[in-house]
């Protein structure tokens, strides 16, 4: 279970899309990713947040193993049609932001409130759908989420996100995990919410999904 979540945590990326119908504002990686307004008060945006290249530069020195893994997986994702990525990380204190940056490879060890969101933009919706259904994007595939066997998952429209979606929820050793991965239009979003109640976690995912136009 922890191995599956660790693999999943390696993989979060946000997107930039085309112009909204009837308006001049573009949907961007920054506008889709988790925002402070999506979260309960007190959560801090970690300095490691940013586009995927900036994220990699920031984690390289403190977690070289994570850097190498994500760099290889991001290069692979681009070969399958990914064109842009953004990472949003929030924690309940500045010290916990630093703890994440030093151990990004395994967020399952976090006993504090943590939100990590990667969203990927693909060249088109078909590439995004294939990324979700057929590829391992940034180390993720639906089978990875389901590999723990006994852990309950919800898939498809029942998640409230999209037809291509999967949500895992788990309480383990005093920790709570909410992991949602979904494809909507040109975007694939990977979201991990740790140590929040399920209603709050679902609200965060819904807010992110609602900004994909």
Spans of model-derived segments:
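Short, well-ordered beta-strand elements
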Residues: 116, 178-195
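N-terminal "mature-domain start" segment
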Residues: 18-103, 151, 203-211
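Sec-dependent signal peptide recognition
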Residues: 2-10
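A short acidic-to-branched-hydrophobic micro-motif
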Residues: 85-132
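Long, low-complexity, Ser/Thr/Gly/Pro-rich intrinsically disordered segments that act as flexible linkers
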Residues: 36, 45-47, 52, 107-121, ...
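Active-site beta-strand termini and strand-to-loop segments that position acidic
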Residues: 102-105, 170-172, 182-185
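C-terminal motif of bacterial Sec signal peptides marking the signal peptidase cleavage site
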Residues: 13-16
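Short Gly/Thr-rich strand-loop-strand
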Residues: 42-46, 52, 126-178, 207
């Amino acid at each position: 279970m922890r191995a599956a979540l660790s693999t999943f945590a390696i993989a979060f990326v946000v997107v930039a899309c085309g112009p909204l119908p009837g308006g001049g504002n573009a949907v961007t990686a920054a506008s889709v990713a988790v925002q402070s307004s999506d979260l309960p008060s007190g959560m801090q945006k970690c300095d490691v947040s940013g586009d995927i290249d900036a994220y990699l530069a920031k984690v390289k020195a403190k977690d070289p193993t994570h850097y190498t893994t994500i760099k290889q997986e991001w290069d692979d994702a681009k070969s399958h049609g990914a064109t842009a990525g953004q990472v949003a990380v929030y924690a309940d204190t500045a010290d916990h932001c630093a703890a994440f940056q030093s151990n990004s490879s395994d967020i399952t060890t976090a006993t504090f409130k943590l939100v990590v969101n990667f969203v990927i933009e693909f060249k088109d919706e078909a590439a995004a759908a294939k990324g979700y259904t057929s590829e391992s994007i940034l180390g993720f595939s639906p089978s990875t989420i389901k590999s723990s066997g006994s852990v309950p998952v919800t898939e498809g429209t029942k998640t409230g996100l999209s037809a291509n979606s999967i949500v895992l929820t788990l309480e383990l050793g005093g920790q709570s995990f909410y992991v949602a991965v979904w494809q909507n239009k040109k975007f694939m979003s990977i979201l991990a919410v740790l140590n929040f109640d399920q209603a709050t976690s679902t609200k965060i995912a819904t807010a992110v999904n609602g900004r994909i136009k």
